[in-house]
């Protein structure tokens, strides 16, 4: 990984690098082998075909035939169904995970690849793509030591979203949940705004995140309260 100053430009015009912003406000440029990018396209197709039947129906991210639009349609339809009763309060929790792709636990991923009966060659390819990576940081003329990474997926790869979808697939809460890769929306309805169903679901989500080596970003996790009453 290389940290350096980069002039921002259209990613559509210049596809040679992937740009991301670190938590320190520094632009991260990740250079990848062109052969690796081509190979990823083929492998990602096989991964999607194998995993499609096991994929959570409420997962809409990076999936053929599903999109942000279909996710919003489902959310709107869910809210509309609750609007018939003017006494209902609907609470929607929009959950964000901190550095989701960077914190992908390779051991957790290996266990879930086995859980979903991935063929050995696909499992080995995904794990070998992530295992044994090293990185260093360069700022100006100064370079850090080279260190090995034990978690995460390289930024801008197809493997990142695919691996995260596999990890989050078994996230099942007691309340309706809509997923878009690493973004999760949880919907609760009650006649009493002080109902604790959403809080209990949040505890479930927190426990699941700890078990899977992930962290909820409390700064970006927001709640929206909706009431259909008049006046």
Predicted regions, residues:
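Hydrophobic "anchor" residues on beta-strands that sit immediately upstream
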Residues: 92, 178-179
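Short beta-strand-to-loop capping motifs
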Residues: 186-190, 227
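Short helix/loop segment flanking the catalytic signature motif in cyclic-nucleotide metabolism enzymes
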Residues: 190-200
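Glycine-rich and small/hydrophobic secondary-structure elements
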Residues: 209
